[in-house]
Structures are given as structure tokens and as C-alpha cells.
């Protein structure tokens, strides 16, 4: 598996992964039912950020987007989001994308990285981020409407780079 910067021609392979994860309604509060053209700006980052793909034998298995969490005086803190093909979860793709992202953020000069909205019921993600040194610094209660669990909290997770 290689991780490389995403190109425009990757979007047709990224979009079905994005659409499946958003439709499941368990991890992101992005608008549901978006067309490929509507969804593209939600995922494909422009500089100073970037979007990458995890690819194996020409097939995209996951993607990550990363960049400044806030503009101006908050731009020294990075943020990132991740997608892994539901059929390929549990194979280390998310961890590989996360490690790539942390390295990229360090090299880009960010001081730290913050995830603003990790769904507290997403135990695999919470475990992954904690194993990579992230701490839960707060939880916004009942701020995500999970399709099966109802209202659940969103963790803010942070680590220095």
C-alpha cells in the first residue's frame, strides 16, 4: 500500500467511500445525499492543506484530508479527517493514514493537531487516536445524532507534534 497526494482523477474512487460513510451516519456530520460535485469540496483540500489516498494495486482503500484547524492566529494547529473503505476497515489503513498525517503536519510546521468532533461511540477511532498520543480534552454532550444510539457526545481530541 502506498499513500500519495490525491489527484483530481482519484475523486471517482474516493466518492463512493465518502458517500457510504456519510450515509451510514455514524462518524461525520457532513450533509447526506450529496452528489459527487456537491461532496467534492467537503473532502478535497486546497493548499495549505492536502488530501491523500491509500492505494493498493491501483485501488483506493482510504483517504485523509489535513490542514490548518483555524485560519490566522489559530493556523499553527492542524486538523484532519479520515475515510477507510468499510470493506477494508480493520486492516491498518486508518493507522497508516494517521501516521502519514502526523508526519506531514510536523513537516508542514504545525505545533499540534486537534480533532474537533470524534463521535464518542466510534470506539475504534477513539482507541486509534489515543494509541497515537491523542488525549480527549473535552466532550460536547449530545451533539451528534447517531442513527441507532440517538444523541451522543463529540470528543475534542488533541496532541502536540
Predicted regions and their residues:
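A short beta-loop-alpha structural element at the N-terminal edge
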Residues: 2-14
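Acetyl-CoA-dependent GNAT
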Residues: 8, 31-87, 98-100, 104, ...
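Helix-loop element at the rim of GNAT/NAT acetyltransferase active sites that forms part
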Residues: 11, 16-33
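Terminal substrate-recognition subdomain of acyl/acetyltransferases
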Residues: 82-83, 117, 140, 146-161
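Conserved beta-strand-loop-alpha-helix junction that forms the acyl-donor binding cleft
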Residues: 89, 115-125, 143-145
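Conserved acetyl-CoA-binding loop-helix of GNAT-fold acetyltransferases
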Residues: 90-105, 126-131
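Conserved GNAT acetyl-CoA-binding A-motif
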Residues: 105-118
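Conserved acetyl-CoA-binding loop of GNAT-fold acetyltransferases
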Residues: 130-139
Amino acid at each position: 500500500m502506498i499513500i500519495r497526494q490525491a489527484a483530481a482523477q482519484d475523486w471517482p474512487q474516493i466518492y463512493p467511500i465518502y458517500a457510504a460513510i456519510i450515509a451510514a451516519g455514524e462518524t461525520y456530520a457532513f450533509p447526506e445525499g450529496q452528489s459527487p460535485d456537491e461532496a467534492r469540496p467537503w473532502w478535497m483540500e486546497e493548499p495549505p492543506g492536502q488530501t491523500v489516498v491509500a492505494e493498493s494495486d491501483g485501488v483506493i482503500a482510504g483517504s485523509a484530508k489535513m490542514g490548518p484547524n483555524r485560519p490566522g492566529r489559530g493556523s499553527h494547529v492542524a486538523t484532519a479527517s479520515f475515510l477507510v473503505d468499510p470493506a477494508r476497515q480493520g486492516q491498518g489503513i486508518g493507522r497508516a493514514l494517521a501516521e502519514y498525517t502526523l508526519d506531514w503536519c510536523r513537516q508542514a510546521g504545525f505545533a499540534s493537531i486537534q480533532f474537533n468532533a470524534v463521535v464518542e461511540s466510534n470506539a475504534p477511532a477513539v482507541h486509534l487516536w489515543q494509541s497515537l498520543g491523542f488525549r480527549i480534552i473535552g466532550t460536547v454532550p449530545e451533539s451528534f445524532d447517531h442513527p441507532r444510539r440517538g444523541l451522543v457526545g463529540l470528543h475534542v481530541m488533541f496532541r502536540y507534534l
